[in-house]
Amino acid sequence: MKKIDSWLTKHGLKNRLTLVVIVIFIIFLILLFMFVNLSDEDTGQITITENAELRTGPNAAYPVIYKIEKGESFKKIDRKGKWIEVQNHAGTEKGWVAGWHTNLNIPADQSLSSNPLKGKTIVLDPGHGGSDQGASSSTPSKSLEKNYTLKTAKELKKLLNKEGAHVKMTRSNDKYVSLDDRNIKGDAFISIHNDALDSSNANGVTVYWFKDKQESLAQTLNSAIQKKALLTNRGSRQQNYQVLRQTDIPAVLLELGYISNPTDESMINDQLHRQVVEQAIVDGLKQYFSS
C-alpha cells in the first residue's frame, strides 16, 4: 500500500485521484437527491400547501368532491398536465387536485390570472315570453315565469358584460320567440326558467343538460350555484329539451326555483337573492372557461 501511495505521490496523481473521488461522490449525492425527489413526486406522498378543492376530474370544470385544507397529505396516483390524481390514506376517496396547490412546485396556469370570459359570446335565453307566460304562482302576487326569466337574464347580462363577455339575448322584451329561433350560436348557451308543479312542496334549483358535451358545463354551474344560493340544490340532470337538443355548443337549461312554492317564489321575487344566483352563474362560467 505504501508503494502505491509513494508511486502516486511521485507522479503527482495522489491529489488528482482525491479530487476525482470527491467529484464522483458529489455527483453520486446529486443523482441520489434527484432520484429521491423524482420517486417522491411520481409514486409517493404529496402535501397540500394551500386550501384547495378535490375534484372528480383533471381540470376546474369538474365538480368538487370536497374542500381540502393546507397541510393535508395524500397518496399520489397519477398526473395529467398540471393536475394530480390523489387518494386519501384511508383509501376511501380519490380525486384530482391542481398541482400548484401542492408541494410539487407546479406553476399555476397563466389563464387563471387573466379574465376567462373576456371575448366569449354567451347566449342568454329568457324562457317563454309574450303569449307564452310559462308557469305562474298561486299566491296573491300571481308571479309569471316569463317576467322573472327576463329580469334574471337582463341582470345577468350586465354582470357578464363587466367581465368582458359579449352577450346575445334570444329576447330582450316581452315577446314570443319560437324554440327554433332560440338556436343562436356562441361559446355557451344558458336557458333561464322557473319550475312549477301542482304541489307546492317541490322546491329548489335544477340544472339540465342533454348532449355529452353539455354535461361538464352543467356540473360546473350546478356546483357554483350550490355554493351561494339559498335554494335547495336538485343537482344536474339529463333531459331532452329542444333548446338543448338543437344546439351544438355547450348549453344548459336552468330551473331557478319553483314559482309554485311560496318560499322559492319569495326568493325569485327578491332582487338581492337573484343577484346572488346570477353571480354564482358568472363564477361558474369563469371556472368553466378557465379549464
Curated annotation (Swiss-Prot):
GO cellular component: extracellular region; outer membrane-bounded periplasmic space
Gene designation per UniProt: lytH
Ranges for domain MurNAc-LAA: 122-286
Keywords associated with the record: Cell wall biogenesis/degradation, Hydrolase, Secreted, Signal
SH3b domain mapped to chain residues: 41-105
The keyword Phosphoprotein is assigned to this record: no
Location of this chain's protein in the cell: Secreted
Single annotated GO MF: N-acetylmuramoyl-L-alanine amidase activity
Superkingdom field: Bacteria
Gene Ontology annotations of biological process type: cell wall organization; peptidoglycan catabolic process
Region (Disordered): 123-147
Enzyme class: hydrolase
Listed EC numbers: 3.5.1.-
Statement: the UniProt record of this protein carries the keyword Hydrolase: yes
Polar residues bias: start-end ranges: 133-142
A Pfam family reported for this protein in Swiss-Prot or TrEMBL: SH3_3
UniProt function note: Probably involved in cell-wall metabolism.
Signal peptide region: 1-40
Family: Belongs to the N-acetylmuramoyl-L-alanine amidase 3 family.
The protein's name in its UniProt record: Probable cell wall amidase LytH
